[in-house]
Swiss-Prot record:
The chain crosses the membrane at residues 13-33, 142-162, 170-190, 192-212, 248-270, 280-302. The keyword Protein transport applies. Signal peptide: none annotated. GO terms for biological process: intracellular protein transmembrane transport; protein targeting; protein transport by the Sec complex. Belongs to the SecD/SecF family. SecF subfamily. Its main location: membrane. This is Protein translocase subunit SecF. The lineage of its organism: Bacteria, Bacillati, Cyanobacteriota, Cyanophyceae, Oscillatoriophycideae. Keywords: Cell inner membrane, Cell membrane, Membrane, Protein transport, Translocation, Transmembrane, Transmembrane helix, Transport. GO terms for cellular component: plasma membrane. Forms a complex with SecD. Part of the essential Sec protein translocation apparatus which comprises SecA, SecYEG and auxiliary proteins SecDF. Other proteins may also be involved. Gene3D superfamilies: Multidrug efflux transporter AcrB transmembrane domain. It comes from Picosynechococcus sp. (strain ATCC 27264 / PCC 7002 / PR-6) (Agmenellum quadruplicatum). One of its GO terms (molecular function) is protein-transporting ATPase activity.
Length: 323
């Protein structure tokens, strides 16, 4: 028994799911912009400054009896006159905290740590982590990352327009925007709820997602083009459905085998790679979904709407003449 699956018949459902996901993502980024003046919670990589993370020394008797309070640490930081700052309590036991401030020199950092120790108790020197990035470097990293994204989008449009046609490229880019927006929306929500910050690794993840998604879309589009050449009389809806059926197993298998190591990294990897892996997991799932259910159905809808014949290239005409 052959499994027949039609993406065209349920395309309004697929588009509705994507529309809801995109609207939710825009909403989360809007709330984040209202609260943080940025659509995502930026790390030091982008805004510059100093971040100090340290834990209480629980080997000292009674030092970790009471959990840390954000307000207590915030008052200490404010009294040091270091400017606007952000305090986060980390871990379930609430014995670790981080403080992010404008850029501090060595003396200012030492005074701040001394003041914190006198207020909240002994700090474990082995857990002190200090990161400092200048504001100019942060801006340069952000600009370079955005430029890389724009160049990748432009390159994809040019490549797909040459290999296929412009409408193929247009809907492939629409699918990529879908993947990037949904991934960013999830991280906007994580930034609001859990204080998750995005750094330069997040931009690397977005570029990787773009590459994965466009590759998946090209596989389906290539099958559509070949089927159009072989069956010129078929309706574009039939061709797209048949093409998706032919490539569905490949798309699912590729996505699953890619996700397995990423899930392992997310569950067992270090804190640096955890959210990088999560971004890739979300993006790859979205990329597979958009390639199968969004890019292909949009192409069929557009061709039907404009009354374009299914033949995509002169090459198809030549094949017919030779036969």
């Amino acid at each position: 028994m052959t499994f027949k699956f039609s993406v065209i018949k349920q395309r309004l459902l697929w588009w509705s799911i994507s529309a809801i996901a995109i609207l939710a993502s825009v909403l989360f980024m809007g709330i984040s912009f209202n609260q943080l003046q940025a659509p995502l919670r930026p790390s030091l990589d982008f805004v510059g400054g100093t971040k100090i993370q340290v834990a209480l020394d629980c080997t000292v008797a009674g030092n970790c009896t009471d959990p840390l309070e954000t307000a207590t640490i915030q008052n200490v930081v404010n009294n040091q006159g270091v400017g606007s700052s952000t305090v986060q309590i980390l871990g379930q036991e609430r014995t670790t905290f981080s403080v992010r401030t404008p850029q501090l020199d060595v003396d200012q950092r030492s005074r701040l740590l001394d003041a914190l120790e006198s207020e909240v108790g002994a700090l474990d020197p082995g857990t002190i982590q200090i990161d400092s990035v200048g504001p100019t470097i942060g801006r340069e990293l952000f600009v370079q990352g955005m430029l890389a994204l724009l160049v990748s989008f432009f390159g994809i449009i040019v490549y797909l327009s040459i290999r296929f046609q412009f409408d193929y490229a247009l809907f492939a880019i629409a699918a990529l925007f879908h993947d990037v927006l949904v991934t960013a929306g999830v991280f906007a929500l994580l930034g609001l709820v859990l204080g998750v910050e995005v750094d330069s690794l997040f931009l690397v993840a977005l570029l990787t997602i773009i590459g994965f998604s466009v590759n998946d879309t090209v596989v389906i589009y290539d099958r559509v083009r070949e089927n159009l050449k072989a069956d010129e009389g078929d309706n574009i809806d039939q061709v797209v459905d048949h093409s998706v059926q032919q490539t569905l197993g490949r798309s699912i298998n590729t996505t699953l085998t890619t996700l397995l190591p990423l899930v392992a990294i997310f569950l067992f990897g270090g804190s640096t790679l955890k959210f990088f892996a999560l971004a890739l997991i979300i993006g790859f799932i979205c990329g597979s979904y958009s390639s199968i259910f969004v890019a292909s159905t949009l192409l069929a809808w557009w061709r039907n709407r404009n009354g374009q014949p299914p033949t995509v290239t002169k090459e198809a005409v030549n094949v017919t003449e030779l036969s």
